[in-house]
Amino acid sequence: FDSIGGAENATHIGLTGGEPLLHAQRAVEFVSYAHHRAPQAHIRLYTAGDFLTEDILERLRDAGLSELRLSVKLDVADTPEESRATIDDAVRKMALVKRFIPHAMVEMPVIPGTKAAMELLLCELDAVGAWGINLLEFGYPFNDWGEFSRRGFKAKNPPYPVVYNWDYAGGLPIDESEALALELVQFAMRKGLGL
């Protein structure tokens, strides 16, 4: 944090990269330090949520955490029961987080073939007060195409309306992900969801 010149003037600070809560105490210390150095900053933490506890959430809140984003991933290869278990787990985690961090949301890739499960997830997250959801275009990260092919995915062609640097960390977009994301936004609007 201190190596970034002018960090005390930051408006937003995010802690991500792997799973920050593998080292929960260090994550709490980082949030506390960042909040002390830049009290005006909106401090966000990204997590899969596997290590969330009331104690950790209380310490993060007290340290100055403004927002928590849960990572959720549905899989087109999942059975309906497996999708249901993923949704239940995400909703349980969101309900727990909301008790401590009001600005709690989900950030997840939109995977073609998961429309029904995604719609259910949106409704259930909204019901427990999720602050929002960040729908990410699903990307191929340039390794192990076999798993993508096995699930029936295809790279979008052309990948982007405007050509830019192909070494973008997200990889190539998967066909139909963007269209499904737009359908999900329309679904949320039709249902009057608050997230």
Residue ranges and their predicted role:
Residues 8-23, 37-52, 63-90, 103-112, ...:
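Core AdoMet radical
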Residues 24-30, 53-61, 90-92, 118-121, ...:
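Distinct, well-ordered alpha-helical segments
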Residues 5-6, 61, 126:
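Non-catalytic positions within long, well-ordered alpha-helices that form the structural scaffold/packing
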Residues 28-39, 61, 94-99, 185-190:
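Surface-exposed amphipathic alpha-helices with a cationic face
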Residues 89-195:
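Conserved C-terminal portion of the radical SAM core fold
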Residues 1:
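Canonical Radical SAM [4Fe-4S] cluster-binding loop centered on the CxxxCxxC motif
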